Amino acid sequence: MAQPTFFTKPPATALADIATLTKALLVDPTRGDHVITGLASLDEAGPMHLAFFDNLKYADQLKATRAGACLVSPRFEAQVPAHVAVLRAAQPFRAFVRIAREWHGDALRPQSWVGNDGIAPSAIIDPTARLEDGVIVDPLAVIGADVEIGSGTVVGVGAVIGPGVKIGRDCNVGARTAIQCALIGNDVLIHPGCSIGQDGYGFIFFGPEGHLKVPQTGRVLIQNNVEVGAGTTIDRGSLRDTVIGEGTKIDNQVQIGHNVTIGRNCLLAAQIGLAGSLTIGDNVALGAKVGINNHLKIGDGAQVTAMSGVKDDIPPNGRWGGFFAKPTKQWFKEIIAVERLVRDSRADPKDEGRE
């Protein structure tokens, strides 16, 4: 449940109004005046909390819940205890998120950590930088020459914005983030500790002079409505730019190499490693700890299972997984075949007595 120490306390709201907000049906209208004061999980909810249920793994929690009301699909409605008011919704979690966004908008987009509403006295801003009205710069942030920052953007504590960087409106640059050689659109959320625009890993290896560094003279382009998780690193391009497409959501601790192009509305889970000059299409989903080799193409709509290693191009809408990754149906068949071989070898009487 939301802690009032960190987040705004929701307004006390009648169930009838919650049904309207969530577009759910209150099965027993006589409970419409019951007041809800917060959101909680099934196991932590009390009589004045709203919860949701959409996964049978939590059936025991539903049975024991003390929640005042529960969003649930018609399929599971009969399992809700009698003391819990039922809000019928085709997609319970989506309905729950709808009211969570209504009540906890402050959790969607971080603001100044220190309650700052302007330029902190300890911030260092080059006189050639251009900041629109309404920009917030927290203490100890550094903004370099010729930087442009749009209105509504928050630059966190200790963040460093290098010369010539352009950041759009209504963005958030997390504490201790470093940005250089980058152009960033509107509504971009960059969590703390990110590094954007640093050198890519470019060398001529094992030559007579050792490892010869290749100049990295490209940029990072981040389009509108992108989210970049904490501790993520995005290298600038060597010749062409590194591009993150509109609406893409990147989890924590992801490494994106130089010259990578990521399309629109992609999903990248934590600890992914993308090697250089990789092209990823639109609406691609990559599971946690996926590694993808350089110079590959991942087609629109492709999905890759967590902890897979990709060394080949993936066609549009491909479903791949494994190490090395291959179409998931083939991967599963091979796993079953290997398990069968192991099982059969153990049952072979010729193997008795062998080490």
Curated annotation (Swiss-Prot):
One of its GO terms (molecular function) is N-acyltransferase activity. InterPro entries: Hexapep, Hexapep_transf_CS, LpxD, Trimer_LpxA-like_sf, UDP_GlcNAc_AcTrfase_non-rep. It holds the Pfam family LpxD. CDD domains: LbH_LpxD (cd03352). It catalyses: a UDP-3-O-[(3R)-3-hydroxyacyl]-alpha-D-glucosamine + a (3R)-hydroxyacyl-[ACP] = a UDP-2-N,3-O-bis[(3R)-3-hydroxyacyl]-alpha-D-glucosamine + holo-[ACP] + H(+). Keywords: Acyltransferase, Lipid A biosynthesis, Lipid biosynthesis, Lipid metabolism, Repeat, Transferase. One of its GO terms (cellular component) is membrane. The keyword Membrane does not apply. GO terms for biological process: lipid A biosynthetic process. The active site is at H258 (proton acceptor). It is an enzyme of class 2 (transferase). Pathway: Bacterial outer membrane biogenesis; LPS lipid A biosynthesis. Its EC number is 2.3.1.191. Catalyzes the N-acylation of UDP-3-O-acylglucosamine using 3-hydroxyacyl-ACP as the acyl donor. Is involved in the biosynthesis of lipid A, a phosphorylated glycolipid that anchors the lipopolysaccharide to the outer membrane of the cell. Homotrimer. Belongs to the transferase hexapeptide repeat family. LpxD subfamily. This is UDP-3-O-acylglucosamine N-acyltransferase. It comes from Bradyrhizobium diazoefficiens (strain JCM 10833 / BCRC 13528 / IAM 13628 / NBRC 14792 / USDA 110). The lineage of its organism: Bacteria, Pseudomonadati, Pseudomonadota, Alphaproteobacteria, Hyphomicrobiales.
